[in-house]
Amino acid sequence: MKKHLLPLALLLSGISPAQALDVGDISSFMNSDSSTLSKTIKNSTDSGRLINIRLERLSSPLDDGQVISMDKPDELLLTPASLLLPAQASEVIRFFYKGPADEKERYYRIVWFDQALSDAQRDNANRSAVATASARIGTILVVAPRQANYHFQYANGSLTNTGNATLRILAYGPCLKAANGKECKENYYLMPGKSRRFTRVDTADNKGRVALWQGDKFIPVK
């Protein structure tokens, strides 16, 4: 997959193989008509967990994205930022965007630090045990421009995002290659200024369908 395209899982970094904390979708979107977002997290283990959450602004949600400064200290807020989560319990984390209302799309990494509560309460003599029982999970939050301009071009099986907000694009229908079966489906996130050609679905076939989401609005393309 080309580097400039966003697959359905935008980014996942530093995750422990034995993940105890369920943070839901790896990528979340705050649409242009909303300034709040809620994510439900769940402790799927039989022991309490200490959860700490940190926010970082990114230049890009792709692998080469760099941490950059926020335009203002309270650009993106969350609550709670730290909590004790009992075994098999859930909690709703709320995010509030208070940044510029301009035409720029913004990207943030939500860093979840997950630690077994029993380990977190140990003294410094047992710090090595804490490290092995801890996890750092990275998910992505995309804040659509407050002044979103949704535009696209489609030709010969290729979609180009000519607007300023990320699109969710999809194709479904007959498979391009018989080895893939009869029916195929593709889903991607397409950033502003990028193009995507579908490689599994035969979009040239009369039964091939292409569509996209502009925020919460479904748009048939073909």
Swiss-Prot record:
Pfam assignment, any one: EcpB_C
The UniProt entry, under SUPFAM superfamilies, shows: PapD-like
Question: Where is coiled-coil annotated?
Answer: none
Q: What InterPro entries has UniProt attached to this entry?
A: EcpB_C (IPR040695), Ig-like_fold (IPR013783), PapD-like_sf (IPR008962)
The alphabetical list of record keywords is: Chaperone, Fimbrium biogenesis, Signal
Q: What induces or represses its expression, per the UniProt entry?
A: Negatively regulated by H-NS. Positively regulated by IHF and EcpR.
Entry annotated with the keyword Chaperone: yes
Q: Where is the signal peptide?
A: 1-20
Per the entry, what this protein does is:
Part of the ecpRABCDE operon, which encodes the E.coli common pilus (ECP). ECP is found in both commensal and pathogenic strains and plays a dual role in early-stage biofilm development and host cell recognition.
Family that this chain belongs to: Belongs to the EcpB/EcpE family.
Output this protein's name: Probable fimbrial chaperone EcpB
State the species of origin: Escherichia coli (strain SMS-3-5 / SECEC)
